[in-house]
From Swiss-Prot:
Gene Ontology BP, a term: protein insertion into mitochondrial outer membrane
Gene from which the chain derives: MDM12
HAMAP family: Mdm12
Annotated localization: Mitochondrion outer membrane; Endoplasmic reticulum membrane
Family per record: Belongs to the MDM12 family.
Main localization (coarse): mitochondrion
Region (Disordered) location: 75-101, 209-251
Bilayer topology term: Peripheral membrane protein
Protein name in UniProt: Mitochondrial distribution and morphology protein 12
Disulphide bonds in the chain: none
Organism: Cryptococcus neoformans var. neoformans serotype D (strain B-3501A) (Filobasidiella neoformans)
InterPro entries in alphabetical order: Mdm12 (IPR027532), MMM1_dom (IPR019411), SMP_LBD (IPR031468)
Length: 388
């Protein structure tokens, strides 16, 4: 089955659409050439002009079949790269939502839930030692008298715990004539359990003399209960709302076409690059090089496969033994059989100085490089994949 292609639609009747298509192809080619590997003596390659020409290709459909498994198996690396990009995007979105959930008007404030037995100032640990505090401040007086005043027993109506500060040796055990210290005020913090501060301190002890209470009740140990971040910050959703849903498979069924292409083209393609001399140092000398491709002759058997599940197109060239060109010229290299003719015009040097035109050795070298690249990149088992 043969296909008739109206090649003239690429240039007529709307020339503006043709210009837009040419510009998009130039941008695509420049992006691919920027990432492509090139020899050390070839500088950056840039496409400056592109024209489809007037001669169209002859295309024959040889077969339609199922997609080769090798295309999907060989594209696993691309799948892993896409999945990794998607996971990275999801992680960034979750981090963004988590940071937004933790923002509040109290940013910069630091609150700590302190146990009722610990000090309210400083970070030093606290251990209740009433005898140590009494003798530290009034040791000589009470050792002479041989007894403790009633105000230092737990039976005192206004009994309070002694608070030992690391920055001062003063004891804060209240005397009978002292004014009672202000009650401990804990700022209102989201997630704070009111039951931790609602009970009075004296409720933890019986109203008994010091000699009995000190020997019977164990000494409380300091405990700090930090506020858990999980109690105040909501957990992020399993799938962020900002991420687009995963694309469903295409409704177009998967298929594979075997095509025979014969194209004597008169397209025009202009490239700019440079010849670099890296001796005795890197970029020791560079000569501007302008290449203009004015036509080529391509004869190839092409396999084009479409994967509806992944929405991708795979393209490769096969060396079919049934091809007439293969039977006639078995001794000709594959690259030369595929690309039998490539017309190139070259210019070396600066336009405002001395210019060498149509240098045969340079042109033949470029043709050999193009043929080798065509075989290494597109001839099966190598293939090119386009993600739609």
């Amino acid at each position: 089955m043969s296909l008739d292609i109206n090649w003239s639609l690429l240039s007529q009747p709307d020339e503006s659409a043709t210009d837009q298509l040419s510009e998009s192809l130039i941008a695509l080619l420049n992006a691919q050439l920027a990432e492509a590997h090139r020899p050390s003596f070839i500088g950056p390659i840039t496409v400056t002009a592109f024209d489809f020409g007037n001669a169209g290709p002859d295309l024959e459909v040889k077969d339609i079949r199922d997609v080769w498994r090798v295309f999907d198996q060989g594209d696993d690396e691309g799948d892993f790269a896409e999945e990794e990009k998607q996971r990275e995007k999801e992680r960034e979105e979750r981090d963004k939502l988590r940071n937004e959930a933790l923002k509040s008007s109290l940013d910069g404030e630091r609150y700590e839930l302190v146990d009722r037995y610990s000090s309210t100032e400083g970070t030093s640990s606290f251990e209740y030692q009433p005898e140590y505090d009494i003798h530290e401040q009034h040791g000589d007086d009470y050792r002479i008298r041989g007894r403790r005043p009633l105000s230092y027993t737990f039976g005192y109506p206004h009994d309070r715990l002694a608070v030992h500060r690391s920055s001062s040796s003063r004891s804060f055990i209240p005397f009978p004539f002292d004014h009672p210290p202000p009650a401990l005020h804990i700022p209102s913090t989201p997630g704070l359990n009111p039951s931790l501060v609602s009970h009075p301190i004296s409720a933890r002890f019986s109203r008994r003399p010091m000699s009995i209470a000190a020997s019977a009740a164990p000494r409380p140990t300091p405990r700090r209960r930090p506020i858990e971040p999980s109690s105040t910050s909501p957990s992020p959703p399993a799938h962020p709302a900002g991420l687009p849903p995963k694309a469903s498979s295409s409704s177009i069924p998967s298929l594979q076409l075997h095509l025979r292409l014969s194209h004597a083209s008169d397209l025009h393609l202009t490239l700019l690059t440079s010849l670099q001399v890296n001796y005795p140092s890197a970029l020791f000398m560079a000569l501007p090089l302008k290449l203009s491709i004015t036509g080529f002759q391509l004869n190839a058997d092409i396999v084009m496969a479409y994967s509806g599940e992944k929405n991708r197109v795979h393209l490769t060239i096969v060396d079919d033994e049934s091809n007439p060109a293969h039977k006639e010229d078995k001794q000709i290299p594959l690259g030369q059989r595929l690309l039998s003719n490539l017309q190139i015009e070259s210019e070396i040097g600066h336009a405002d100085a001395h210019v060498l035109r149509n240098v045969g050795k340079v042109e033949r070298f470029i043709v050999d490089v193009v043929r080798k690249t065509l075989v290494d990149e597109l001839v099966f088992p190598n293939f090119h994949t386009v993600a739609l």
